[in-house]
Regions:
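Core catalytic ATP-binding domain of two-component histidine kinases
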Residues: 1-211
């Protein structure tokens, strides 16, 4: 699996680099080139992650460093924007400028945030037009060091909430229940407190608090 993933990401990054170089001299292409660089960085991050994962045949232990939390969250938001746009979901970013650096493994945390946003988008999409409202996801940081991903999807029942982080439990028809277990393990290894539930205002919040 690692071999196939790395071969694929290598091909993608090579193509992105070629296209970026071709467009970089064109007027009005700055934003497109910027998005391409974000995608390239994400491919490299995925390659590093899958290689480390395969080396130990388990979730790798975090290799932590000081990371600017707002920059990490902003990058993930930009990476997931296209997927949300395709689903007619508005993806917002609200970063508190007072939030500073935290010690974390950037590659692992990128995977966590991508999984959370993807799950929120799929939840909103599952409700479809029956929900009768615009789908929205907000990624927010607040002091001292909190990440909150909020969505206005159909919500989570108390019964489901109690099972969410159990292996092989999934609310998706073809789900394998691996994503949330991965998230749980990574957050636990970082010493983070976290929760996922639907509140009385009808919004579902995934909260991650750094110690």
């Amino acid at each position: 699996i690692a071999h196939e993933v790395n071969n694929t990401t290598a091909g993608i990054t090579s193509t992105l680099d070629t296209v970026e170089q071709a467009l970089s001299s064109e007027e009005g292409m700055e934003d497109i080139c910027d998005v391409m660089r974000v995608c390239t960085d994400r491919c490299f991050s995925m390659s590093r992650f899958i290689t480390r994962f395969a080396d130990v045949v388990k979730i790798p232990e975090p290799t932590v460093a000081q990371v600017q939390l707002n920059e990490l969250v902003s990058m993930c938001k930009r990476f997931m924007e296209g997927m949300c746009n395709d689903r007619n979901i508005i993806l917002r970013l609200e970063c508190d400028p007072e939030v500073g650096q935290v010690r974390l493994d950037a590659s692992l945390f990128e995977q966590v945030l991508v999984n959370i946003i993807k799950n929120a988008a799929e939840s909103i999409e599952s409700a479809g037009e029956a929900a009768g409202k615009q789908g929205e996801i907000t990624v927010r940081t607040t002091v001292p060091a909190l990440i909150e991903i909020v969505d206005n999807g159909p919500g989570i029942s108390k019964e489901t909430e109690a099972k969410l982080f159990s292996p092989f439990f999934s609310t998706k028809p073809n789900g394998q229940g691996i994503g949330l277990v991965f998230i749980r393990e990574v957050l636990s290894r970082h010493g983070c407190a976290f929760s996922l539930r639907t509140y009385n205002d009808g919004l579902t919040r995934f909260r991650i608090l750094f110690n």
